[in-house]
Amino acid sequence: MLIAIDGPSGAGKGTVARTIATQLKFRHVDTGAMYRAVAWRADHLGIDLADGLAVAGVAERAVFDLDGRVGIDGHDVTSAIRTTAMDAAAATVARHPDVRRVLVARQRDMGRAGGVVMEGRDIGSVVFPEAPVKIYLDASPDERARRRARDTSHGAGQAGAEPDRVGQVAQALEARDLSDRTRAASPLMLAPDAVYIDTTGVSVDEVVAQVMDLVANRRLP
């Protein structure tokens, strides 16, 4: 079985996907981390992120390590890719059709055998439209901004999100949403047969319980 979890930044995809994967003993694949890692690697190789063909070459040659942490070509980038700057870099990289073509193919290889919880923005709509369980997580703009401010603070090695950063993060999220929803290749969208879950004010345990119920129903003969 493959479980597809989509949604915008700050909707809770990562926490929910990791928890479900642990409970089911499935592999967890964060496809957003792959785009971020490629952006990080290309930048450190001195490649212009606006050059889609060059960045696609990085994606094609990349050796990923997604087992608990995020690695690319021998570099552990788990924390380095969780910054506001990398949010923008990943958005730039994700708009290139050539990059998406390469990474979608690699993601399909990862999920083809099943036993995977895959999260991203186009899993249920493009990568695995035939997935038996498709979830779309969302939350209010304020809730998402608070979560992302906290996450990027942790990624930068800070103890917590500063209150005055939340507004800045909210603006960045608005720009990222526009980029994700209007890009020509695999835009962020709710797949017609996906289950929409609003996580605003809802605990992780409650969301996980909803998803696990869906998984149980899909497994029934």
Which residues does each PLM region occupy?
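N-terminal phosphate/diphosphate-binding loop that engages ATP/GTP or pyrophosphate donors
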Residues: 22-84
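Small-molecule kinase domains that catalyze NTP-dependent phosphoryl transfer to phosphate-bearing small molecules
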Residues: 68, 107-114, 121-126, 130, ...
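Hydrophobic positions on the alpha1 helix immediately C-terminal to the Walker A/P-loop
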Residues: 16
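P-loop (Walker A) phosphate-binding loop of NTP-binding proteins
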Residues: 8
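Conserved lysine of the Walker
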Residues: 13
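ATP-dependent NMP and nucleoside kinases share a basic, alpha-helical "lid"
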Residues: 78-81, 85-153
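Residue-level signal for inorganic ion chemistry
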Residues: 32, 74, 103, 117, ...
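Hydrophobic anchor at the beta1->P-loop junction of P-loop NTPases
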Residues: 3-5
